[in-house]
Amino acid sequence: MKRRFVRVISSAVAALSVVAVANAPQAAAYNTLGCKWSHSGISFYVPSPYISYPYWSNAAASWGGLDGRILWNTRPADFTGLNESRGNTVSWTGVTRALGTVQSFPPCSGGHWVSGQMEVVLNWTLVSGYSSSKIQGVAAHEIGHAFGLAHNTASTGILMYPYDSRTVSGPASDDKAGVNALY
Ligand SMILES: [Zn+2]
């Protein structure tokens, strides 16, 4: 189970991630990871020198107005954001992972994530060729994972669609419904 979650959450472009969600019902166009925060005000911090900073900022704002809310640039942080240049050594353009790992799932205790032990990352090598809105879409997608949402392949118009060919740069109504169901 844990290994499957690792694949779902970490492989933005891997075929395995589609296989992992293929058996999930698609009627409600959101899926959940099986872990979430124990509170609805979720603090997120990104150091301002990072080149990814404006994308994380805009992506966090795009998730506003929900029952589960991102408290942007608040410390101590439940999760942090950064960018790395990993070239093609990984398949992901963005990842949500345990702090300091390449792509391991964050620790989950009693159905809740452990504050401070999660980070969201943009692989700058791959996203630097993207448009600004597409980069923001990858960032917002990772924040969706950080809420507790899993991939959903029902439509390219869903933010949690697993590939960067998604047609939205922020949460759609189905994505928001998923977060409101979680918190
Ligand atoms: Zn993803």
Identify the meaning behind each predicted range:
Residues M1-W37:
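N-terminal prepro-regions of secreted/extracellular proteins
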Residues A22-Y183:
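Zinc-dependent metalloendopeptidases
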